Regions:
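Secreted/periplasmic carbohydrate-active enzymes, especially glycoside hydrolases
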Residues: 1-163, 171, 182
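Flexible loop residues that form catalytic
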Residues: 168
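Catalytic cores of alpha/beta
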Residues: 177
Length: 193
């Protein structure tokens, strides 16, 4: 598995830690783990030994002047395509992931009559416009990519920039989250109960 942790994201710099989880059937003296986004000119590698079992290798990325991900009304929802690859002897594997680089924070400042409650996206105040989302169908296998596309496109057409996924539903298929990323729509994900 591959996990991207955005440590710091500003218009000037993005620091991302990429944790690559590697299952090895035996001890290996050396494995090369590379994370790259060739179209963006980004690449970093780490060489590490592997032990039999599960290994975690962290590859730091430092990106100057990153193209930030924005909600649809604030800018372009730019997505980087990163490829994480592992090479050890004759064995190799890779995984490609698309992610948007952004900073998002909930602002809770004290004011005269209470506390603020709004989001900042990449340092800009965000007026959240959205809806609660429940599963498109109780029979999940009937929900196709086309159904997800229509649902997300309809939300975008009425200028929504955030969908709250209801906690009494399900964790949606990856295509739901990918389409939201592409369309510049934030997801407020409730935990299931």
């Amino acid at each position: 598995d591959v996990f991207y942790r955005q440590q710091e994201v500003t218009a000037r710099r993005a620091r991302v830690e990429v944790e690559v989880e590697i299952a090895s059937v035996r001890d290996l003296a050396e494995a090369v783990v590379t994370v790259a986004s060739p179209g963006e000119g980004i690449e970093a590698s780490v060489t590490a030994p592997l032990r039999s079992g599960i290994n975690k290798v962290t590859v730091p990325l430092d990106i100057a002047s990153p193209k930030l991900w924005w909600t649809r009304e604030l800018g372009e929802p730019h997505l980087y395509e990163f490829r994480a690859s592992v090479a050890a002897g004759d064995a190799s594997d890779s995984r490609t992931t698309r992610i948007g680089l952004r900073s998002l924070r909930l602002v809770r400042d004290k004011v005269a009559d209470g506390t603020t409650f709004y989001f900042e996206l990449n340092g800009e105040p965000l007026f959240a416009k959205g809806a609660n989302y429940i599963p498109c169908d109780v029979f999940l296998p009937r929900v196709t990519r086309a159904v997800y596309e229509k649902t997300i496109d309809d939300a975008a057409a009425v200028n929504m920039n955030m969908l709250r996924v209801w906690g009494g539903g399900v964790y949606e298929d990856d295509v739901f989250y990918e389409l939201c990323d592409e369309r510049g729509i934030l997801v407020w994900q409730d935990f299931m109960f």
